[in-house]
Design a protein with these regions (language model features):
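Family-specific signature for flavin-dependent thymidylate synthase
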Residues: 1-320
Length: 320
């Protein structure tokens, strides 16, 4: 078995993901977004806020300015799922030009399960130890026998492009794979999902680590809006408009008024006499006495003013 590079993340029994190179990061995203009026930012917090705005409103082009290039090694059946993401540039190990290597994927016992009765593309349930051992034995037997025949044909001078056809899809291949951040996040969103096949999920999770390291603000925004955020259909929104009591909306709006006030005060500290009028300006309804009790509790969290105001508008549109 060939050695896994020291700077790579091992995936499955013999595979890996290695970040070869990257171009740009969070700074490249904001640079591209601001080019229309040629103005930079002086604060890191402003860069973070802009990236979050871009992600929230799905302005994808600035994220395409960041590039990642990986060296990956995976079973062929994983590569065939992977290659469906057609925006990438790929150069794969050629079995027409080069000889195959005796490297085959054999699943660990804990990942051998039954076919799911609910998901035609999934697995479920607990398999007996005897059956797990039999599955592993079959994997090894077919792998060994197919490679033995392949080697025999190869030694007899049969064309490699033909001899390779008898090799099973658990044979390992490798490639260089390059993509931009926007499409890489789309890949991760699909392939790190709990419904994705385990064997490709481990590669996606490994790639996610490098994204988090290279573009931490973009990764944070992706987690907040793409992974953990919710979007409602027209039908779902109509249900909310009819069923969500106004008193619940008013309570949330009141919390937002406090959060906006706290955020504005954090960004630009005000005197004590200015804080309550600032809160009232944000639509707050509490009396000055009640406001002071809540404000002095220290439990009010700051956020992003733009996000909070957009959320406020959405909530107000739901009021009956």
């Amino acid at each position: 078995m060939s050695k896994i590079p020291e700077d790579a993340i091992q995936c499955l029994d013999k595979g890996f993901v290695r970040l070869v190179d990257s171009m740009g990061g969070d700074d490249a995203i904001v640079q591209a977004a601001r080019v229309s009026y040629g103005k930079g930012t002086s604060k890191v917090s402003q860069d973070r806020g802009l990236i979050r705005y871009l992600m929230r409103h799905r302005h994808t082009t600035p994220f395409e300015m960041v590039e990642f290039k990986y060296h990956c090694k995976m079973p062929i059946f994983v590569a065939r799922q992977w290659v469906r993401h057609r925006t990438a540039n790929i150069n794969e190990y050629s079995l027409r030009y080069s000889e195959a290597r005796d490297e085959f994927y054999v699943p660990d016992p804990e990942h051998i399960q039954f076919q799911s009765s609910l998901n035609k593309q999934g697995r479920m349930g607990t398999v007996s130890e005897d059956l797990k051992a039999k599955v592993q034995d079959y994997f090894k037997e077919i792998s060994d026998r197919s490679f033995e025949i392949y080697s025999e044909l190869n030694n007899a001078g049969v064309a490699r492009e033909l001899a390779r056809a008898i090799l099973p899809v658990n044979l390992y291949t490798e490639w260089y794979w390059k993509n931009d951040l926007h499409n890489l996040l789309h890949f991760i969103g699909l392939r790190s999902d709990s419904h994705a096949q385990y064997e490709i999920r481990v590669f996606s999770d490994a790639m996610a680590k490098s994204v988090k390291a290279v573009a931490p603000f973009a990764w944070e925004a992706y987690q907040d809006y793409a992974v953990s955020g919710l979007r409602f259909s027209r039908i779902e929104q109509n249900i909310l408009e009819k069923q969500l009591p106004n008193r619940v909306i008013e309570d949330i709006l009141e919390d937002i008024a406090y959060q906006i006030t706290a955020t504005l005060h954090t960004n630009k500290p005000r005197s004590e006499s200015e804080i309550y009028p600032l809160y009232k300006k944000q639509g707050g309804l509490d009396s000055e006495e009640d406001f002071k009790l809540k404000w002095d509790s220290g439990e009010i969290k700051s956020g992003n003013v733009r996000e909070l105001r957009e959320f406020k508008e959405k909530l107000q549109s739901l009021k009956n």
